[in-house]
Amino acid sequence: MGAVLFATSCSLDQDPISDFSEITVGGKDTTDTSVKFKTKEEMKTQYDGIYKAIQNAQEAWYADMLVLNETHSDNAYCGSSGAELTSLEQQTQDGTNKNIERDWNAFLGYINTANRVINNVDLVPDQSLTQAERKQWKAEAKIWRAWILFDMVRLWGDVPVVTEEAPDITAENVEEVYPLLYPSRKPVAEVYAQIISDLNAALKPGGAPAVNAGNKFLLTKSVANALLARVYAEKPVRDYAKVIQYAEAVQNDGFKLVPDFSDLFSVNDAKTDVNFRNTSESIFEVTYPVGSGNWVTWMFGIDHVDPNSTYNWAKWITPSRDLIQAYENEGDNVRMNQAIVWGQPSWSNHYPSDHYPFMYKTRSKYNSIIKIRLADILLLKAEAYVETGNLQAAAALVNTVR
């Protein structure tokens, strides 16, 4: 999403960062107040907290992001007729929109989960936490922080760049601590500088882990390279040579397009699980295996592995007529049938109720939320080739994805 959304229309409630600074595990060392986590186990809880936050970010970092991206690109209607969603679709939102406030606060909270690791992992006195683990955990946390800052700057333009944890406020330190509790917004250029710094730091030797074919729910070097390709394609002064450079770095990590597009989303015939996780095309996906499951699937339609699931309210992200027409114009039934499913709900907000389209990719509670896949990066690289005049190379990449 290249355009900055809501930058001028909203006056957001910048809740104090201390709201997100509660340390639930560990405590202050009586001999060194700078040490919050004294054991490897305590620090591991904070590291694991990053991935738990990602799994739990289904509302702000997935459903809401889809609303903001897809309705503004005319790929979808918001679906529900609630005032918050309708104003977002119509771009008439203001500072009273609770969804925006919710996402703003959530994103600052995600950044704080990263900062807990970044700022504390090197201070843990427990030597069973190895230097290799410290470097890797910090690198993964920096990728997470950079990713959230990237989404924030694209949505809101100038945003706070929070890299420190706020200490407890007292009468003696109020002037020093106040800017940490109520951070001011930084110019877009400064935000992008922090994003690039974090991602480059994560790519240093001994930093982020290499790709793991059996676990794509991992903030790897490939994720950092993919994000850098996106960053250089969307920052105010774009650098398409770097887009190509980082896209090629992703390709060199061995990802492959899946032979069957349905492999990314399909469930098995028994409807007891998805057919595949961690495909060769996936770069980063949030997994929800049997025994856990996501809840966000029912925001878009029914849960196709649950026979009791019903269309009980007007769902989010209704595919638009423009999107459906685009598929039909290309004769692309393969992708359309994996992206859109038709149902018969009780409402007719955008279509007749006897033939109503719903988003289909996240079709069950067992489906992963695929945040980055190879096709995204190949098409981004193709765009960079177009911008640099290499139309033949761009066409070859587009045809590969097709």
Predicted feature residues:
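Flexible, polar/acidic helix-loop-strand segments at domain edges
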Residues: S87-Q90, E165, I169-T170, P319-L374, ...
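Extended ligand-binding clefts on enzyme/binding-domain cores
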Residues: N252-H355
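Sec-dependent bacterial lipoprotein signal peptides
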Residues: M1-T8
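Conserved, well-structured interaction surfaces
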Residues: D32-V35, T39, K44-D48, K52-N56, ...
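Short coil/linker segments at helix-helix boundaries
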Residues: R134, D158-A189, A193
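Membrane-proximal, proline-rich intrinsically disordered regions
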Residues: C10-V67, A247
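Short, surface-exposed recognition loops and adjoining beta-strand edges that mediate ligand/DNA contacts
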Residues: W61-G82, V159-E172, A208-F300
